[in-house]
Amino acid sequence: MHTTQKDTTYTKIFVGGLPYHTTDSSLRKYFEVFGEIEEAVVITDRQTGKSRGYGFVTMADRSAADRACKDPNPIIDGRKANVNLAYLGAKPRVMQPGFTFGVPQIHPAFIQRPYGIPTHYVYPQAFMQPSVVIPHIQPTATSATASSPYIDYTGAAYAQYASAATAAAAAAYEQYPYAASPAATGYVAAAGYGYAMQQPLATAAPGSAAAAAAAFGQYQPQQLQAERMQ
């Protein structure tokens, strides 16, 4: 004689989240308030004999199982359990209000693009280095040509060079018998243009100006006039 197995799809309940000290009797005691119980079993560990944290309860009818599953706060042996029909599995845990979980924000530049297109990485402002600005140092008049490879073509520098050139020209033309044109000594270059150039060579020795002046002194005016008259 073959016995037909009873359909327990809507009467067998899965109970999860049980403490280690929960037994079959304590599990049955909790579900008795919902109706008649056919079976209550706690799954235990074979070596230790303690509860593995879940069990199964089979109610006599479907209405009793529905009442047990609708309990909003099932507390078994001091711990809230997860009660649901066995064929549905454990209920998904509901987030309790008042708790927020922060998700780290991902910068849009670090999201990988499809089809193998390379991603342009954008670095935060904190990692960007500022542009290097070289401060301009105004050279002094005495050390402009000796310490800096760039000649300062400002008005002050031209005034210095113009005065020195005027003095040297006056010393040279004093020994020449013919008067020089005023335009030659009164010319001063316009200032305002500046550009970088190589380090200028050392100025001519003072002896060269003296040698040129001596050569003009030895050439007599009479000889010049005689040559012009020929």
From Swiss-Prot:
Entry remark concerning the domains of this protein: The RRM domain is necessary for mRNA stability and mRNA translation regulation.
Protein name as annotated: RNA-binding protein 24
Protein keywords: Cytoplasm, Differentiation, mRNA processing, mRNA splicing, Nucleus, RNA-binding, Translation regulation
Domain RRM: 11-88
Gene encoding the protein: rbm24
Broad class of the protein's primary localization: nucleus
Function: Multifunctional RNA-binding protein involved in the regulation of pre-mRNA splicing, mRNA stability and mRNA translation important for cell fate decision and differentiation. Plays a major role in pre-mRNA alternative splicing regulation. Mediates preferentially muscle-specific exon inclusion in numerous mRNAs important for striated cardiac and skeletal muscle cell differentiation. Binds to intronic splicing enhancer (ISE) composed of stretches of GU-rich motifs localized in flanking intron of exon that will be included by alternative splicing.
One of the protein's GO biological processes: circulatory system development
Organism in which the protein naturally occurs: Danio rerio (Zebrafish)
Gene knockout outcome: Morpholino knockdown of the protein leads to death at 6 days post-fertilization (dpf) due to heart growth defects and absence of blood circulation, despite the presence of a beating heart. Show reduced heart contractility from 30 hours post-fertilization (hpf), onwards. Display defects in sarcomere organization from 33 hpf, onwards. Show altered expression of key genes necessary for sarcomere formation.
Annotated GO MF terms: mRNA 3'-UTR AU-rich region binding; mRNA 3'-UTR binding; mRNA CDS binding; pre-mRNA intronic binding; RNA binding; sequence-specific mRNA binding
Classification via InterPro entries: Nucleotide-bd_a/b_plait_sf, RBD_domain_sf, RNA-binding_reg, RRM_dom
